[in-house]
A protein has these predicted regions:
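Hydrophobic/aromatic-rich core segments of domains that either
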Residues: 1-55
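N-terminal accessory/pre-domain segments preceding catalytic cores
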Residues: 24, 47, 52-175
Length: 175
């Protein structure tokens, strides 16, 4: 029993092609080409995958391209049920939720030896608040990221890359 799928085309500045798959009766986009990080990140973290376009819905694809399939009429993909950031509990709608996800994900990385994780934020405002407030010292000079590091007894360093600002994704690196 195979998975129903199709090739879809569209364009930004150039023509582009990716896949759609049908899982549990709903269609999703998968674009492994656009989920590949930049050359600099790939060199440092060769196994990194971004997951922005993994089991995503139309609205995410349409942020960056125009779907104009010449091969077939693509079905509607309007479910986020299997979207990576939802399934992995890496999607935050508030700053407090983002802090909780960051702390839990740091703990998982420390326990497993993984070097990085990603979270996606609900809005551009939350993205800006998170990237700002994480490193903003309070009246005692302590930042939220410092609090997380201390609470986990982590002896290394946690940094973040706001590499995917347009998509509201932050990559955290533990070293």
């Amino acid at each position: 029993a195979g998975i129903e799928n199709m090739i879809v085309t569209g364009y930004t500045d150039v023509d582009h092609m990716w896949n759609m798959v049908k899982l549990e009766g709903k269609w999703y986009h998968i674009d492994v080409g656009w989920d590949k990080p930049s050359a600099a990140l790939s060199e440092r973290y060769p196994d990194m995958v971004l997951y922005q376009y993994f089991l995503s819905e139309d609205s995410i694809m349409e942020n960056n391209l125009i779907i104009s399939n010449m091969l077939c009429d693509p079905p509607v993909a309007d479910s986020s049920d299997m979207y990576y950031f939802n399934v992995e509990n890496k999607y935050a709608e508030t700053y407090d939720q983002a802090l909780e996800i960051i702390e839990q994900s740091c703990r998982r990385c420390i326990d497993s030896g993984e070097k990085y994780f990603m979270i996606k934020l609900d809005s551009s405002n939350l993205y800006l608040q998170t990237t700002s407030d994480l490193i903003k010292p309070d009246s005692e000079g302590v930042t939220d990221i410092d609090r997380i590091v201390r609470s986990l007894n982590f002896k290394g360093q946690i940094s973040y890359i706001d590499y995917y600002k347009a998509y509201r994704i932050i990559i955290f690196v533990l070293e």
